[in-house]
Amino acid sequence: MNHLQQRQLFLENLLVGVNNMFHQMQKRPVNTCCRSLQKILDHLILLQTIHSPAFRLDQMQLRQMQTLACLWIHQYNHDHQVTLGAIKWISPLIKELK
């Protein structure tokens, strides 16, 4: 398996794991999902430092993961303040949710 195939497999597995966790948001409190998401994001950051360049996600891909997380939280939580707090926790660069 060449580097491009390995990278594609890695990204697909990562997306499946993140997507599976978000589907559980209907069954679990938002705070639990936020903690799980934070672990995933921490793991992504760790992978950035230990993997060869073929496996590293670029800034755009990391940002897409954060955006996906924020969209899922917003979709499954109807309390605006809790949603905003969760999103700020995951992605501190987001100033406000409109």
UniProtKB/Swiss-Prot annotation:
Top-rank taxon, per record: Viruses
This protein's UniProt keywords: Host cytoplasm, Host mitochondrion
InterPro entries to which the protein is assigned, alphabetical: Rotavirus_NSP6 (IPR006950)
Major localization class: host cell
One family name in Pfam for this protein: Rota_NS6
CC annotations in GO: host cell mitochondrion
Cell location: Host cytoplasm; Host mitochondrion
Chain coiled-coil ranges: none
Nucleus found in the keyword field: no
Self-association and partners: Interacts with NSP2 and NSP5.
Family statement drawn from the similarity comment of this UniProt entry: Belongs to the rotavirus A NSP6 family.
HAMAP family hit by this protein: ROTA_NSP6
Protein name: Non-structural protein 6
Organism: Rotavirus A (strain RVA/Cow/United Kingdom/UK/1975/G6P7[5])
